[in-house]
Amino acid sequence: MCRTLALLASCAAVLAVAPVSAQRPTTDPLEPGLDTVITPTRLVQALSDVPASVTVISAETIERFGIRSIPEALRIVPGMSVIHATGPDYQISYHGTNTLSPRRMNVLIDGISVYRPAFSEVIWSQLPVAIEDVQRIEVTRGPNSASYGPNSMLAIVNIITRNPNDMTLGLGAGTLGSNGLRELTARTALRLGETAVGVTASTSRDRGFDSLTQDTAGHDSLRIDRLAIRSQSRTGTQSTLALQASVARGTAEIPFIDNFQQSYPDRRFEDFYAGAQWATQLAANHELSVRLDHARQSSRQSWRTCLPTVALLPEMFALWRANPRYANEVLAGRVPTGGTPTDNALALAAITAIQALGAGALAPRCVRANQDVIQRRLDLELQDTYVFSDRLRVVGGLGLREQSGESQTYLGGKQSSTVRWLFANVEYRPVEPLSLNVGGYFERNSLSPSTFSPRAGANIRLAPGHTLRLVLSNGTRSPDIQEQRTNWSYRFEDVTPPLNGSTTAFFYQSRTGPGNLKSERIRSREVGYLWNAQSMGLLVDARVFDDRLSDLISERTNLAGLVPTNAGSVRLTGAELQVNLRFGSEWNGYANYAYLDNREATNILERTQWSRHSGSIGLSRDFGGGWQAAVAYAGQSGNGYQQSAYGRTDLVLSRAFDVDRVRWRATFGLQRLDSPLATYSIGSAEPLESRRSNRLAGYVRLAVTVP
């Protein structure tokens, strides 16, 4: 089975790609001007019918406000916590909580998850999509495990790219800016019979921060190159085939890993994604689709470090494995007691080895360490959508995933798991003012016990343009391979001078996974209100919520830290307001605010990323003659443990003009930080700091579009 899936995925990669969403958002016919979305339930629904609060960031908004990256776009989302820790490192989570592991939010690109299976992470700076290819971003604010399963526990971000059928013949764009910013993007699209193909290549360079706690020289630049191919084909009168493949590769500078390092532990990465979706219209009211996705994410990280010889002794490695307390006692120069006879024998062997070294026990030996990781996932999913009547629609499906992580350091080799799932969502309108949504997602995971995530929502149209929303939902996050099955140890090579005649050695500390972790859980309650005043160009979405998170894996994961447990919990309550404005053809704007209360946390780490107050506001105007200007502000109060406040003002001025049917657009952007210093927590006694030398930053961008 796995070999067959792998072969199919490889074929899909060769063929090229396209968005894999069979249902494209349109406009709600009942309320003209009101967007429809697909992410919350997998059904195309009007915002007034979805059982969730949704933020939609359009390509127009991205262009108007000079947004240059997806992490920066998410600052618009009410309640979204965005911390730019270092140049390549963004810590992003809806409602924050644990900054050490912001792994409770799923991220999709055209419905394909980029969530990494072995470490439950999303590396935002390595997303394989150029901002120029983004058609819209749909953010479901609240648990969405009922539609997409575990890991969509707090929210889900769905990045929807441009359909090749809608792309122009060519696009070229270049950006120059402060902090060494250099960006180039080129895109072309063409039609080959019944197939439309789009190809985008981009490259980006950024110097990062000017100074870091762990490196005053600010060694945190990012260099990344991307290539994406998408295709959309008609394979019959009622069927389509969408294919996609993308790669992102580059180098992320890392300033620090250990106190004895002699070289920078920079990380070289290469991420590959491929997907195929075949969809067929079996009848006017019945659609079937099959999706196959493959991802391979490789990270190579090695550095030179010089450690005291005693830390490399095999006797110390064996003693730590048996009894870490004994090992610490021996290193402190004491004879440990209270252990088993085996512990005592291992302690005696370690003490004898240390005594044999004499003063050389503290002499440095230089080694080459690595944290290389390869993560893979292969998904096959069948989805069936059936419209019984104007009052009843159903979507359901099943899927299979094979996923693995391979790392000699973190996993002692290769660890794999298998995931199977079933899901369904039902939309029912018993009477015209009322829309009901009920859904659930059942998952069986070889890593942890099975889970079921249900959701029920009721949308009541009180009057034209006024909708009351009530939502009850439960969500989960499955423990990842590293949390559950870690076999963490450092095997050093090129030991200089050799130790006992060997050029390899193990660091004395190690860790194994508990193997008995269960899924994290959330129980969410929401009351929302949507006001669509089309005549005023106004759309307002307000909600209050009460989220109770339990069975959290809160502990800091490192060699000498606590063993991971499900002992954590926290309660998140608050309110959010989202306003979109459009006054005629000249004015556009938005205003968002979130109030969040993080309480009853059992572990301080669950309070390392949260802001009681956060929000954003933006306004743009078209002046005619191609001139356009925008101003925006985003900020958060930074109430988390060791977390600083954040605020930034953006000014954008652009001019679009045509020359011989070719559209040119020149953009100038200026940014001002409230503070050049950002602090964040890694669970240690002191916060880490990242600093800019100047509050002001600017950029210029020139884009040309060939129709």
Residue ranges and their predicted role:
Residues 1-67, 71-77, 189, 234, ...:
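N-terminal Sec signal peptide and the immediately downstream disordered periplasmic leader
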Residues 390, 394-395, 429-433, 537-550, ...:
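Gram-negative outer-membrane beta-barrel transporters
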Residues 476-477, 653-707:
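C-terminal beta-signal and adjacent terminal beta-strands/loops
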Residues 39, 46, 71-113, 135:
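Extracytoplasmic beta-strand/coil segments of soluble accessory domains associated
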Residues 176-205, 215-252, 266-290, 388-394:
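Transmembrane beta-barrel wall of Gram-negative outer-membrane proteins
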Residues 113-141:
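Short acidic/polar hinge/loop motifs at secondary-structure boundaries
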Residues 289-293, 297-301, 461, 469, ...:
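Membrane-embedded beta-barrel scaffold of Gram-negative outer-membrane proteins
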Residues 70-73, 90-96, 105-110, 124-127, ...:
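N-terminal periplasmic accessory domains that precede
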